[in-house]
């Protein structure tokens, strides 16, 4: 009888953990508009962290970098090489800040979800989580990427950019148009799904085996979070490069 009660209690606990309250959000009322405050709060925290890092590491620049300046220059060189590889030697420079901003924001957001216990901060409704754990954030980033590669193509080719939709044959016009909708969808849902799944798995494991299993899973989550940031930035740069070079 005790075993049955224990199993029933365990099942109830798992059901509570797996129940994601998708409709529960914390809103700010601004005039006649409701602003989704949860993702704004955590996004501002990430922005402050990145701004603080930039300020601290660049306030005393030296010809021979040391410490934080050396680290930031290494990150910048990595982002520059990634952008140059995907966009091309001649066109990549103006896009380094955009790709770098995407990569760093997603990277720090993902890691904040794995390292910072957002849920200990109580809200009237819903709960805090990593910015990229919210579909609003990932869709916004994907739409920014879409605007960027449309701008890149139109800026370089003018109205002739739209000729790519009928290449290599006009029969592919519907497919090429559909592709422009699937790109932001795939970017946003891939990032959102991976981060949400990682946080749910860690939460379940912590409830079942609090001390042993969650530690390696957290390291795996950190690795996955870094990879997702790299994938998003790489694909964004690739889409921009493709829009300027034509149909690949």
Curated annotation (Swiss-Prot):
The keyword RNA-binding does not apply. Its main location: plastid. InterPro entries: ATP_syn_F0_a_bact/chloroplast (IPR045082), ATP_synth_F0_asu (IPR000568), ATP_synth_F0_asu_AS (IPR023011), F0_ATP_A_sf (IPR035908). The chain crosses the membrane at residues 37-57, 96-116, 135-155, 200-220, 221-241. It is a multi-pass membrane protein. Keywords: ATP synthesis, CF(0), Chloroplast, Hydrogen ion transport, Ion transport, Membrane, Plastid, Thylakoid, Transmembrane, Transmembrane helix, Transport. Pfam families: ATP-synt_A. One of its GO terms (molecular function) is proton-transporting ATP synthase activity, rotational mechanism. It is found in: Plastid, Chloroplast thylakoid membrane. One of its GO terms (cellular component) is proton-transporting ATP synthase complex. F-type ATPases have 2 components, CF(1) - the catalytic core - and CF(0) - the membrane proton channel. CF(1) has five subunits: alpha(3), beta(3), gamma(1), delta(1), epsilon(1). CF(0) has four main subunits: a, b, b' and c. PANTHER family: ATP SYNTHASE SUBUNIT A, CHLOROPLASTIC (PTHR42823:SF3). Key component of the proton channel; it plays a direct role in the translocation of protons across the membrane. NCBIfam families: ATP_synt_6_or_A. Belongs to the ATPase A chain family. This is ATP synthase subunit a, chloroplastic. It comes from Psilotum nudum. The gene is atpI.
């Amino acid at each position: 009888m005790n075993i049955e009660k224990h199993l029933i209690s365990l099942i109830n606990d798992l059901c509570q953990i797996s129940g994601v309250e998708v409709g529960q959000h914390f809103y700010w009322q601004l005039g006649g508009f409701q602003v989704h405050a949860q993702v704004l709060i955590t996004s501002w925290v990430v922005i402050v962290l990145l701004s603080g890092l930039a300020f601290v590491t660049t306030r005393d620049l030296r010809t021979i970098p040391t410490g934080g300046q050396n680290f930031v220059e290494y990150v910048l060189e990595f982002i520059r090489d990634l952008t140059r590889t995907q966009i091309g030697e001649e066109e990549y420079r103006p896009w380094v800040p955009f790709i770098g901003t995407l990569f760093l924001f997603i990277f720090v957001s993902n890691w904040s979800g794995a390292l910072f216990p957002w849920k200990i901060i109580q809200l009237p409704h819903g709960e805090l989580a990593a910015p990229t754990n919210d579909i609003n954030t990932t869709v916004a980033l994907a739409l920014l990427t879409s605007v960027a590669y449309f701008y890149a193509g139109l800026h370089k080719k003018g109205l002739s950019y739209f000729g790519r939709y009928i290449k290599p044959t006009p029969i592919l016009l519907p497919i090429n148009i559909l592709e422009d909708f699937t790109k932001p969808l795939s970017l946003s849902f891939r990032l959102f799904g991976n981060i949400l799944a990682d946080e749910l798995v860690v939460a379940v494991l912590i409830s079942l085996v609090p001390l042993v299993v969650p530690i390696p899973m957290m390291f795996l989550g950190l690795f996955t979070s870094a990879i997702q940031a790299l994938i998003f930035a790489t694909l964004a740069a690739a889409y921009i490069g493709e829009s300027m070079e034509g149909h690949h």
